[in-house]
Amino acid sequence: MSMIEEKIYKGTTTVGLVCKDGVVMATEKRATMGNFIASKAAKKIYQIADRMAMTTAGSVGDAQFLARIIKIEANLYEIRRERKPTVRAIATLTSNLLNSYRYFPYLVQLLIGGIDSEGKSIYSIDPIGGAIEEKDIVATGSGSLTAYGVLEDRFTPEIGVDEAVELAVRAIYSAMKRDSASGDGIDVVKITEDEFYQYSPEEVEQILAKFRK
């Protein structure tokens, strides 16, 4: 396994779901340095536009820098073109940025998702700029195998955002139980045509109480 892969696939679980009425994205909060838990409140999900979010796996410093740059670029796009950017446009911009640094890559794997004039979508982007549109579910990071097991068992194309939020929380929670590099709470957002909503820790706890053993 390369140094880049080790940096990316240790210390994070993120998931994204494309639902019939929106997009749901979730992460856990643990940041690690080898076997050391460096933070129990790491931010791994960012609002980068009105109805758009980005999740990050990998280097915290690289992720924070990219989140700032992409948010600025999204604002500039809207000012220059006098219309809101699409998810595809921001994913392409991010892909081009990462590819331009492919010989000295940012140690991140990203999910960018939301709702725009073209509909709802999520893109996964690798450290050297490869971008793939995910049609239904996606998981990244060290706990992704466990998360995929939960998502694939319960996801349907007709799932709504509220049910998908519970599924995303369940998937992250399952990964946290099996992956020592994931843990310490869950952040989850739902994005619909009407709102960008981030659930509070208390609301997440209420969801967890439904299936926690």
From Swiss-Prot:
Regulation: The formation of the proteasomal ATPase PAN-20S proteasome complex, via the docking of the C-termini of PAN into the intersubunit pockets in the alpha-rings, triggers opening of the gate for substrate entry. Interconversion between the open-gate and close-gate conformations leads to a dynamic regulation of the 20S proteasome proteolysis activity.
Known EC number: 3.4.25.1
Enzyme active site: T12
Molecular function GO labels: threonine-type endopeptidase activity
Places the protein is found: Cytoplasm
GO BP of this protein: proteasomal protein catabolic process
Family: Belongs to the peptidase T1B family.
Protein name: Proteasome subunit beta
Naturally occurring in which organism (per UniProt): Archaeoglobus fulgidus (strain ATCC 49558 / DSM 4304 / JCM 9628 / NBRC 100126 / VC-16)
Gene: psmB
